[in-house]
C-alpha cells in the first residue's frame, strides 16, 4: 500500500483537494489492489503489457493498440506529444504516427494511422482507474488518482464530472458508515467547488448530516461543540439559512432555561457548588440568556468555592515537608511556617519571619527575633516561642530535631515581643532550620495569616473551609475543595469543562499539550519556581542492594534521558527538566542561584546496559566469594520491588525503569504506594522512588540523608561530609561542602539520582490573583478571587 504523506512533494500535491485530503485518506475503506478490478478493456491492455502495479508508481506512458490486421498487439510507448494532449480525429490516409517504444528508448518508430485501433493516454488511463475505484467504493485510491490528475493534467476530459461523482458518492458512503464529521466536510467541499451540482440533493444531504451531527454531540453531552456547530452553520448559510439552525437554537434556549431553573432550585437548598455548575452550563449554552450572568455573579458573591484537582492527598500537612508534595501543599493552606522560604538568592534562600522581623549578627552567632502584635489572637509571645525552640532541641521530645539541636546554644527572652537565639557555632542560614509550623496558641485560633481549616472528607473530596477571624473579601473563596483523581485525563476533561478550576502538579507531557491547545486563551499553565529532584532510594537490605557496584549497574541500566524526554516530557524539552548526577538540583542554567550545591564536574553516567551486565557479574563474583568464606551459598538476584508514589509521572517512570532492568536480567515489580513510608517503618519495598524539594541544599542535605530522613544513610563518608557541611562558617565552605557531598554520593550511590523535573499547574481564567511561578500552589492564596462575568 502506498503511504500518501510520505514526502513533501506528495503533501504539496494534495493541496488542491483542501480539507478532504486527510478525511478521505484516513477514513475511507481499506485500499484494494488493482488486481481485484474487473477485466475492463483497460485492464486487459495493461495485463497484456505486463503493467499490474499502480499507474501512479509508473513513469508516465501511453499505449498504442494496433488493429487486428496489423497484429492487434498493444505497445507501451513514451507519452506522445499531441497538441494539448488531445488525440487528433482528422488524420488522413497515408499519415503516420511517430512513437518511442519504451523498450528501445533511443529509437523512433512510425506507425500508419490506419493501423492504429486505439490510443490510451496516461491521464485517460488514470481517469478510467479512478472511475472503477469510485464504482467499487475504493475512495482512498480514487482520491489519489483524481488529485494527481488535478495537479498534473487538470484539462483531462471528464475530470470535473468524475470529481463531482467522487465527492457525492464518498459523502454518501461516509454518511452510511456514520462518519458524520467527515461526510459533512466532503459535502461542503462539493458545494463550494460545484455550487450548481445537484443543488437540492446536496443541500438536503447537508441538512440531514448537520442535524445528525449536532444531535450526536448533544447526546454525548458535548454541548460546547454542538453549540459551536450551530453557530458556524448560522454564519456560513446566512444567505440561505438551513432549517436545522432555527430548530437547534430553540432547543438550546429551552435547555439553558432548564439549567437556570435547576440552578435556582439548588441555590434555594444552599447547594452553591451545584447551583454554580448548573449556571455555568446555562451560560455555556446561551451566554446572553436574560439574567444569566447576574445569577452566576450572585452565586459567586454568596458562597464562592474553588475546586482543585489533585493526584495525591496527605493526612499530615507540613509546611517543611521535603519529600511529600501533598503534605507541603496542604500545609501551605492550613499552617504558617515560622520562617517561610520565598525564593532563591545570591547566597542561599530568601526567608520571611512570619511573626515580624529578624536580624542575624555579623559574626553569625546570634539571631534576633522581633514579634509584632505579640499576645494578639493566634500570635505567640516570645516565651511561647522560646519553649518551642527548646523542645525541638531536647532529645526525647516528639518534635526533636537533631540538626537544630546541633547548633542551638541558648534562647534569651527580652519581653513579650523579643528574643535572641545563640548558636554553638556560626551558621550561614540558621533560619533555614526554622520552617516548622507556628504552633497554635489555642484550639480555637490559628496562626496569623492562616485562612482555612480542614472541614472534612467526602469521598474523594477534601474540604477546607474559611476559618479566619475576619470575613472573606467579595468573591474570595469561602471553601477550597481538593478533588482526588487517579486518571490525569479525567482530571483534564473535568478541568476543561469547568468542574474544577485548578489542576495541581500536571503530568509534564500533559502540561505541554495544554499549553499548545486551542483552550490556551481560557486556561493558564504556570510553572512552579523551582524543580523537584527525583531519585531511587534503597530501603531494604540484601547482599546485592548493599553492594555499590550492583547499585551502579542498576543506574547504568536506566536510560534516564529517554525516560525523561520521551515518557515524562512527551518528546519535548524543558529548561528545568534534565538528568542529574547527584542529590541536588542543577537549575535551568549553570548560573541559576539554586545550583550552588551542584558539582558540574561530576558527569552523568551514560546509559550502558552492557557495562551494567559486566558490573553485575563482578558484584556477583565478589559476593559469591564472600558467601563461600562463610560457608554460605549466594542466592540468586531477588525480584526487586520498586515503590512509587501514586501519581502519573512516578508510575510512568517506575514502569519504564522496571522494564529496563529486565534487559540486564534483574527481575522487578512495580508497587504503587499511596504514602512513602519513613525509614523508621518497616519498608514494604526494596527501593522507593523519591521526589524531593531540595531547595536549600545547605540545610536540606541533612534533612535528606540524616537520621530519620527519607534517604537516611549510615555510609561513613556521607555522614562525615554532612558533619563538615554543618560546620561550614561561610558560603565558600558551604558551596565546597555541598559539592564534595555531591561527589561522594555519585561515588558511593546511597541513592540513584535520576533527574530534576520542572513542576507546573493549570488554572482557569475565572480565577485570578494566583501568584506567577510560586513555590507552592497556595503560596498567596489570600489573593485568590473569582472574576465575575
PLM features per residue range, with description:
Residues 763-789:
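Long beta-strand-rich cores associated with HINT superfamily self-processing modules
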